[in-house]
């Protein structure tokens, strides 16, 4: 449909009028026999004339509808499809599902023809697939994988009217076992399930919440909680609060503020406490027994076995695009089996060991003409890296280590 407009006249550089007047005065003062000069600085006036403006014919304009995102990795989105993924018979005879089963079921989702299996919505599993794969690929952690799987099944079946209020969690385990990594995955899962409005993780050490004077701790704690709305608040190093026999005024402010917000802001954020199980009980829950009941889930990460330590070392080597000497794999495995107790911080210690091993390797091959052996770690590299690792950890005697197995 057309709409008519009055002709629009627009003048650009209206200051040309004043320039014209000035130039005219100057020309009058010129001598009669002098050639008239042309003012090259004068800008021309430009006029735009629009007779009418025409709108697009909206009645004939095609509208584009964006289809919803489908998370099915084998889905063709066809309501008449003949290639719907087949659910294996094994699932009909199962009485208990594990993490592998949930991942497999998520891969069988079809947005038109296969949306549910029994009481489980397959689309939600399809959405969670990448996060579940990430969790499943972690080395060890069998106990926590089983616990998270049970939690997921409960929430997937929508049996809880207010699931956001039930997600406060305790993750216990020694340093270096991967608590932070598990927290990241949990936050990712809760976000994809719609329980969080953002994936933000706010990690706070409890001693950072204790103020410099009485009345200062509560605002610090409240600020940390407010910054976690829509995401996850992680409270680490709970032993900083103090033991059950002694609770100062600063620590009491922190605990009371946390407890109050778990009620007043229920469902608006998830609180996760990380640390040793004994420390969490004695230094946190012992001060306020009401707190314990607010944390419905308690996940434990066990210490790593020697074989798992080797797998962690091997994985870190591969992630850095290095290699282990294939001819010495068994000897390297034995090294971790006989020195497992020398890595009390597990993953952290393995990372440090790998760094010193790389340094030892570079010094060993510095004059080596065979570039094909570069970045291939052998037992000697690990032995020398381990010696440096132990020295940095203030170990005084190599006799404490089982180097006889090197």
Swiss-Prot record:
Pfam families in the record: AAA
Positions with biased composition (Low complexity): 13-32
Example of a GO MF term: ATP hydrolysis activity
Residues binding ATP: 173-180
Superkingdom of the source species: Viruses
Region annotation Disordered: where it falls in the sequence: 1-37
Keyword terms of this UniProt record: ATP-binding, Nucleotide-binding
Stated family: Belongs to the CbxX/CfxQ family.
Entry protein name: Putative cfxQ-like protein R730
